[in-house]
Amino acid sequence: MHVLDVVSRAPETGLDMKRCRVLVVNDYASMGGAEVVYQQSADLLSRLPGVEVERFDDTRFPVGTTKWSRSWNIAAARALEETIVGFRPHRVMVHNYHNALSNSILSVIARQKRKLGFRAYHTSHDYHLVYYNPALQYFDKRRPVILPLEMLGTRAALTHRSTTKGLVHDLMTKCYWHAVREAFPPTEIFETIVCPSAFMEEALHRSGITNTRVVFNPSSVPVALQPSSAAGRQRFKIAFVGRISQEKGLAEFIELAESVNFHRIDVIGVYGDGPDRRAMERRFTSLIERGKVVFFGRLPQEELFPQMRRFADAVVVPSLGAENAPLVIIEAAMLGLPALVHDGGSMASTGDAVGNKIKFRSQPESLKLALDRLAMHLADKGRRYSLAEYLPEHYQQRLAEIMELGEQAGTAPSRRTDEAVC
């Protein structure tokens, strides 16, 4: 293991100078998939020998409530700078920042990198580095459409509406995006940008960002279970897991299922909450009354996964956006469940090697065919899923290699002369 040069504790700070300090940053402590990965990364890095981890999220700064503070959160930038100065990290891993933290933190990271000599990394959960809309969507008559990667950097990408809030707002969004990109080039702020999918890496490369490494997000289900069997059954229980909002495509999937008279679908169970839940409960009242759609609400993970295993024969990922690396596909496989996946964006390729994906498009015949394939898949008692690359220990090892931590620490010279360097 790499030996740190200084073995004393700095009296003025109370910091353990023998340990490599890693600051892990994210917009929110808890909300969605990115937050789960944020917490997992902090936990897994903290288990590496000689590594000390500190978290920074919305529990330590005020989230902006105005357009200005959401675009440039000065309070968040100040809080992050105070944390960096006090903690004196050797490594900084930034997950999502474009929502609550805002681009204001980029100036802090750039400035403190010059002063302290730490290395900074970013896990790109969303598409904010490559397009004006972080979901990689544009709007055609208010209808969301996934932007093809071939359009990145072209005139078409510039002219498409990236928001539904009007022309002026769209133009201001694009001007702001380009200004931030010019002032804080991602390749200069971050040593390496971690991509949870090959699709994200391709998007970054097409946008001129090439300092990337693909690292699959770790499953929240620690142990793979035996794949479930539904041999002889003709109708199946399908689970949706996630945020109930427009871009997740749940309403469209329910309508599509209704258009094929719930072909092979016994019931759709919805795990999660979100801004569209009440409207959807009103919209699908008759289906709820008939028991074809059930809303279970949001559950903690320790309750969610066992209940999914008991309830579902398969999960559905009907997202309208490009997504990136939807963990639910992998978590379903860990629970022994196949996944019906909308064929678009990163979802078209994420987890292909796992063996539990069945793709469908937004047409009735495509869904019917996918459900017939699901029946055959579930009837296969000998099926196995390949999950080694999604296990937490694999994720931990890959991060340690990229960030040069613990036994993976390198010997590259550092500009830090005030204390131990990992």
State where each predicted segment sits.
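A conserved mid-protein helix/loop that constitutes part of the nucleotide-sugar donor-binding site
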Residues: 35-40, 236, 240-259, 275-278
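A charged, aromatic-enriched C-terminal amphipathic alpha-helix characteristic of glycosyltransferases
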Residues: 376-413
